[in-house]
Amino acid sequence: MKKILLIDDSDTYTWCLQKYLQHRGYPVKTACTLKEARAAIQEEMPLVVCCDLDLPDGSGMDFLDEVRAADKELPFILASCHDKDDYEQEAMRRGATLCMDKMKGLLLQDKLVEYAYRQV
């Protein structure tokens, strides 16, 4: 079964979101770096990608470009603690499905991931 791919370098944040989504019945795969995310996508294309904007080995925005080159329709959510006004317009131009503030809480993220999940 295809999974939601969570990409974030915060172990605590990833763990919380993973447990939250799994509790609601979503299968989840996690990655802490873009290298791990690329390997996960080569193994199996996810149903939804939820990616942090800033990662240790690159930008979530650049990873969005890579994903869009391979799949134009895959729901891709870009998440960050940064002000969305700083990156949202560029992310949407590059093909992001949604942009969200990680600090808005897990409920909002669950609803946004659920929305993207249903789009497929």
Please state what every model-predicted region is.
Residues 8:
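Conserved acidic carboxylate
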Residues 11-29:
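Two-component/phosphorelay signaling modules centered on CheY-like receiver
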Residues 30, 55-58, 93:
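Residue-level signal for the "D+5" position in two-component response regulator receiver
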Residues 33, 59-62:
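Acidic catalytic/metal-coordinating carboxylates
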Residues 44-50, 55:
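Active-site beta3 strand of CheY-like receiver
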Residues 61-73:
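Short amphipathic alpha-helix used as the core "switch/output" element in two-component signaling
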Residues 62, 82-110:
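Alpha4 helix (beta4-alpha4-beta5 surface) of REC/receiver domains from two-component response regulators
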